[in-house]
């Protein structure tokens, strides 16, 4: 097995490319990332580690612009992300200069996925150890989009999705709670999904909101804290509403069982 373990371009007898699977494992151990598409808004949210007092927090952003109308978040190896983001930005600008038109979200997603796939079958390189969530608005139709790519080079479109740490449980939460929303409700859903895996609340969450009119806006920590407080208040109100109902059920059972 060791031969197939080391070789990037050699399949194992049972059809595995182990280096690609190891890259996917790096994604599963990376920070949690969530993307949610609304009717007029697309939101990216990522888990972030608390920065030291002397570090400039702007230098460790995990959500970046590829173009004015496209943004990307990722889970996995950050150094790999920097290389991939730089290549994608160059492609966006090259396309704009060549055809005098901005790229579509699908076009740049195909480009990124193609790069990731190329690095699974080339000698002297290794697969990118990251999965990306790409959001944006079509420059011609104005329709919002959300795509995901993975280390194998696969890409797909989503209404809402998660990657990184505990992505399965986060995706299950999104499946249960997703509905077509707009504006602030889309932002709240993304933050609620992240709070399923981020224990320390809003201070360890980075959120960016994209609209067609204003492009990408990174939310300040105070704005995130306000939304988290609103979500917690809604949870407390829902729990309080359930308690009288439970008490009534207990009383009803007591009456029915009373001799």
From Swiss-Prot:
The UniProt record lists the keyword Nucleus: yes
One cellular component term from this protein's GO annotations in UniProt: proteasome core complex, alpha-subunit complex
Keyword Transferase: no
Top-level lineage group: Eukaryota
Matching InterPro entries: Ntn_hydrolases_N, Proteasome_alpha, Proteasome_alpha-type, Proteasome_asu_N, Proteasome_sua/b
One GO term of the biological process aspect: proteasome-mediated ubiquitin-dependent protein catabolic process
Keywords from the UniProt entry: Cytoplasm, Nucleus, Proteasome
Localization of this protein: Cytoplasm; Nucleus
Function: The proteasome is a multicatalytic proteinase complex which is characterized by its ability to cleave peptides with Arg, Phe, Tyr, Leu, and Glu adjacent to the leaving group at neutral or slightly basic pH. The proteasome has an ATP-dependent proteolytic activity.
Subunit-level organization: The 26S proteasome consists of a 20S proteasome core and two 19S regulatory subunits. The 20S proteasome core is composed of 28 subunits that are arranged in four stacked rings, resulting in a barrel-shaped structure. The two end rings are each formed by seven alpha subunits, and the two central rings are each formed by seven beta subunits. The catalytic chamber with the active sites is on the inside of the barrel.
UniProt family annotation: Belongs to the peptidase T1A family.
Protein name: Proteasome subunit alpha type-7
Species name: Solanum lycopersicum
Highest classification ranks of the organism: Eukaryota, Viridiplantae, Streptophyta, Embryophyta, Tracheophyta
């Amino acid at each position: 097995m060791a031969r197939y373990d080391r070789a990037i371009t050699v399949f194992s007898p049972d059809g595995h490319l182990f280096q690609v699977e190891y890259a996917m494992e790096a994604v599963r151990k990376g920070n949690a990332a969530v993307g949610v598409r609304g009717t007029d808004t697309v939101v990216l949210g990522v888990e972030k580690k608390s920065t030291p007092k002397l570090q400039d927090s702007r230098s460790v952003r995990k959500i970046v612009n590829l173009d004015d109308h496209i943004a990307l978040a990722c889970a996995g190896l950050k150094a790999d992300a920097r290389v991939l983001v730089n290549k994608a930005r160059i492609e966006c600008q090259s396309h704009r200069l060549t055809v005098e038109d901005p790229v579509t979200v699908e076009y740049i997603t195909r480009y990124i996925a193609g790069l990731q796939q190329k690095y699974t079958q080339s000698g002297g390189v290794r697969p990118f150890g990251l999965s990306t969530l790409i959001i944006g608005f079509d420059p011609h139709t104005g329709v919002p989009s959300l795509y995901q790519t993975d280390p194998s080079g696969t890409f797909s479109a989503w209404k809402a999705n998660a990657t990184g740490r505990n992505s399965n449980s986060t995706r299950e939460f999104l499946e249960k709670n997703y509905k077509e929303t707009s504006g602030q409700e889309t932002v709240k859903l993304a933050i609620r999904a992240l709070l399923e895996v981020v224990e320390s609340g809003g201070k360890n969450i980075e959120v960016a909101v994209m609209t067609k009119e204003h492009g990408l806006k990174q939310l300040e920590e105070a704005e995130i804290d306000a939304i988290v407080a609103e979500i917690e208040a809604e949870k407390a109100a829902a729990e309080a509403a359930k308690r009288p109902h439970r008490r009534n059920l207990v009383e009803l059972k007591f009456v029915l069982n009373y001799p």
